[in-house]
Amino acid sequence: MISKIDKNKVRLKRHARVRTKLSGTAEKPRLNVYRSNKHIYAQIIDDVKGETLVQASSKDKDIASDSTSKVDLSTKVGEAIAKKASDKGIKEIVFDRGGYLYHGRVKALAEAARESGLEF
């Protein structure tokens, strides 16, 4: 059985491999997802300038106050990041799942962002 440390090393290698091919621009920035055991974080990044344009996480007070499950929190983070992005005029993004499988919390965040108006 693969240990937790080895799983994270494999994820980081996968993420590095994908990042060589994937980057965000000002017209189509990158939506990056980081998942910890308890929280989930999302940022929209312009890699050309090297700056974060928008961020949302399950630690935000308005998101964390009334959710019970981690999948519900991920859905709310996806909706929040899409709302903040539309306020900044961002409609199209490149989705970077951070080496995680497109399943569970990562999938919930992505689908909520899509339903809230982001295109990817």
From Swiss-Prot:
SUPFAM superfamilies given for it? Translational machinery components (SSF53137)
Q: Which domain of life is it from?
A: Bacteria
Q: Which GO terms describe its cellular component?
A: cytosolic large ribosomal subunit
UniProt-recorded Gene Ontology molecular function terms = 5S rRNA binding; structural constituent of ribosome
Classification via CDD domains: Ribosomal_L18_L5e (cd00432)
Against Gene3D superfamilies, the record matches this protein to: 3.30.420.100
Going by the UniProt record, its keywords in alphabetical order are: Ribonucleoprotein, Ribosomal protein, RNA-binding, rRNA-binding
Q: Does the keyword RNA-binding apply?
A: yes
Q: What GO biological process, any one, is recorded here? A: translation
List, alphabetically, the InterPro entries matched.
Ribosomal_uL18_bac-type, Ribosomal_uL18_bac/euk
This chain's function reads: This is one of the proteins that bind and probably mediate the attachment of the 5S RNA into the large ribosomal subunit, where it forms part of the central protuberance.
Q: State how it assembles.
A: Part of the 50S ribosomal subunit; part of the 5S rRNA/L5/L18/L25 subcomplex. Contacts the 5S and 23S rRNAs.
Its family?
Belongs to the universal ribosomal protein uL18 family.
Q: Mind telling me what this protein is named?
A: Large ribosomal subunit protein uL18
What organism is the protein native to? Answer: Staphylococcus haemolyticus (strain JCSC1435)
